[in-house]
């Protein structure tokens, strides 16, 4: 006669529950990307910058970075962000951000967002987020998801510097966006390029001081290399 083993039953139930949760979240993610994404996107962007100097800057960066099919649009939410869904690539920046920054700063911001597209960060962040929601009771995955997001932001900073050679422009842009947000000013401080204030393991954005210091260090290193060359 088969003997019931409580521990084995618990393992089977938990395993089945986790698989079911992961399957449901995966399905929801697929449906959202296919049907909800276009509507959400249209609510976050307005007209394009066709024919403007900004559009030319984006095109030049795309050529340098070997990225195709990018549409530069005005952001109606946040200050600057990028989205990639089934090959539809969008970089959006707010008119307020553009008007408050120098051309070099805007170029550095666009390069940062293009770097997310080039590095396929939507996929990396999406996988981390999917795991977090599928295993919602696992605190480690919440830390992992936040860590992945921070790491991809730092990588995008580094990539922006690689293609623009303007680390101080990016540092200045970060400080301007951060200042506008914490002064409760309208426009570019809405918080997608820098993110809300927060430190620690659960913060999805790197510490601002750390980001700026890294960029200053890059500028010093570039200056040293120029002198030695």
What residue ranges belong to the model's regions?
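Catalytic Zn2+-binding segment of zinc metalloproteases
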Residues: 114-131, 168
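Hydrophobic or amphipathic, alpha-helical segments that drive membrane association/targeting
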Residues: 1-75, 79, 135, 142-143, ...
């Amino acid at each position: 006669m088969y003997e019931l083993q409580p521990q084995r039953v618990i393992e089977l139930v938990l395993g089945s529950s986790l698989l079911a949760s992961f399957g449901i979240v995966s399905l929801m993610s697929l449906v959202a990307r296919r049907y909800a994404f276009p509507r959400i996107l249209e609510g976050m962007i307005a007209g394009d910058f066709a024919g403007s100097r900004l559009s030319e800057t984006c095109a030049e960066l795309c050529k340098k970075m070997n990225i195709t099919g990018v549409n530069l649009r005005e952001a109606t939410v946040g200050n600057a962000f990028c989205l990639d869904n089934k090959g539809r690539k969008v970089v959006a920046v707010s008119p307020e951000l553009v008007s408050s920054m120098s051309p070099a700063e805007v170029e550095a911001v666009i390069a940062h967002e293009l770097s997310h597209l080039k590095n396929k960060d939507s996929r990396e962040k999406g996988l981390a987020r999917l795991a977090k929601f599928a295993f919602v009771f696992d605190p480690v995955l919440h830390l992992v998801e936040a860590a992945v997001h921070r790491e991809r932001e730092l990588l995008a900073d580094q990539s922006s510097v690689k293609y623009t050679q303007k680390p101080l422009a990016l540092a200045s842009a970060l400080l301007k966006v951060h200042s506008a947000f914490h002064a409760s000013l309208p426009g570019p401080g809405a918080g997608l390029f820098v993110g809300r204030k927060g430190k620690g393991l659960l913060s999805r954005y790197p510490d601002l001081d750390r980001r700026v210091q890294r960029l200053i260090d890059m500028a010093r290193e570039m200056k040293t290399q120029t002198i030695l060359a």
